[in-house]
Amino acid sequence: MEVDVNGESRSALTTLPLPVAEASSPGKAEAEKPRCSSTPCSPMRRTVSGYQILHMDSNYLVGFTTGEELLKLAQKCTGAEESKGEAVPSLRSKQLDVGLARSSRLYKTRSRYYQPYEIPAVNGRRRRRMPSSGDKCTKSLPYEPYKALHGPLPLCLLKGKRAHSKSLDYLNLDKMNIKEPADTEVLQYQLQHLTLRGDRVFARNNT
């Protein structure tokens, strides 16, 4: 079924205008009511408010034509109205090919850009996704050491006397490049330095 951009239906079978009584019959209004397009078994309307649905595969990825492609298709249809019998099947097959290409391209971009944040490694350990080159990198300034690899710390941690001993942020545990065999040694070393630093802060406060 063909539908104009305005939403009025055009019937390819009858060219004569229908009487008002036939046009407003309840059967025709019921047939014109759009079916639910989420169920694949129900027949879908081919056009939805100016967009033409080309193809829907099993993953519910729908290929649309917009703008210039609709104009080109309309010009092809008007030019091919004289040889209607031969041109319509080829046009349909071409639309299906375009829809297949579009849906596969959508699927490629989906699998490329929407990666989960945690990627399982080969040996079964889960590792955090390292920041890529496109991510915003905060440079470490010499007079602001707490902005080294993370954003600014919350104010409750900055205003307190023992800010660094309370927060584990300056260790940057999630951004470290840990080698697999010696990761426990690195963590033990850093935790030892953390406790030493905390003891030093406590001793400075007591004196």
UniProtKB/Swiss-Prot annotation:
Coiled coil feature spans: none
Pfam families: UNC119_bdg (PF15435)
Subcellular localization: Cytoplasm; Cell projection, Cilium
InterPro entries: UNC119-bd
Positions of post-translational N-acetylmethionine modification: 1
Modification Phosphoserine occurs at: 25, 140, 167
Principal location: cytoplasm
Keywords, comma-separated and alphabetical: Acetylation, Cell projection, Cilium, Cilium biogenesis/degradation, Cytoplasm, Inflammatory response, Phosphoprotein, Protein transport, Transport
GO biological process: cilium assembly; epithelial cell migration; fibroblast migration; inflammatory response; negative regulation of cytokine production involved in inflammatory response; negative regulation of epithelial cell migration; negative regulation of fibroblast migration; negative regulation of inflammatory response
Renumbered residue ranges of the record's region Disordered: 1-41
GO cellular component, one term: ciliary transition zone
Highest taxon, organism lineage: Eukaryota
Entry similarity comment: Belongs to the UNC119-binding protein family.
Function text: Regulates the macrophage function, by enhancing the resolution of inflammation and wound repair functions mediated by M2 macrophages. The regulation of macrophage function is, due at least in part, to its ability to inhibit glycolysis. May play also a role in trafficking of proteins via its interaction with UNC119 and UNC119B cargo adapters: may help the release of UNC119 and UNC119B cargo or the recycling of UNC119 and UNC119B. May play a role in ciliary membrane localization via its interaction with UNC119B and protein transport into photoreceptor cells.
Subunit architecture: Interacts with UNC119 and UNC119B; interaction preferentially takes place when UNC119 and UNC119B are unliganded with myristoylated proteins.
PANTHER family: MACROPHAGE IMMUNOMETABOLISM REGULATOR, UNC119-BINDING PROTEIN C5ORF30
Protein name: Macrophage immunometabolism regulator
Lineage: Eukaryota, Metazoa, Chordata, Craniata, Vertebrata
Record gene name: MACIR
